[in-house]
Amino acid sequence: MKTKTLHQSVKLPASPHDVYEALMDSKKHAAFTGAAAKISPKKGGKFSTFDDYATGENLELVPDKKIVQSWRAADWPKGQYSVATFELKPAGKGTQLDFTQTDIPEEVYDDIAQGWVDWYWDKLKAYFK
């Protein structure tokens, strides 16, 4: 299966701590996305977001700085995982979030890329306004 890598960056009007918490706290994640989330805040812990559409495991967690997760969509072939990396850096009064996702199946790349914009970056901007 051919895969692709996605790179996106977004500036958010909140501290790296607040952005990290929104991504890693189940209640805050549900508040900004409007969808159920179960997220373990520990390395090796599992997560499930958007009513089990996206699932995976926390591979590396550096509070307020970095999140690395194995990540898969429910409709991907069994056993197919990507790796999603969120890097958070202070930027003025906000946060620069640099996002990379590797091993995305080529046939769903465009949908996944747009999904991060629609379901994460735009919603985080609105949440922190």
Regions found by a protein language model. Give the residues of each.
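Hydrophobic ligand-binding cavity/cleft-lining segments
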Residues: 1-38
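Alpha-helical scaffold segments that form or flank carboxylate-/histidine-based iron centers
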Residues: 7, 14, 46-50, 111
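Generic anion/oxyanion-binding catalytic loop in active/binding sites
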Residues: 7-9, 18, 47, 101, ...
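Residues at secondary-structure transition points
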Residues: 14, 76-79, 83, 107, ...
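Short, flexible helix/strand-to-coil boundary loops that buttress conserved ligand/catalytic motifs
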Residues: 23, 33, 62, 71, ...
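Hydrophobic-ligand binding "helix-grip"
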Residues: 30, 38, 48, 52-96, ...
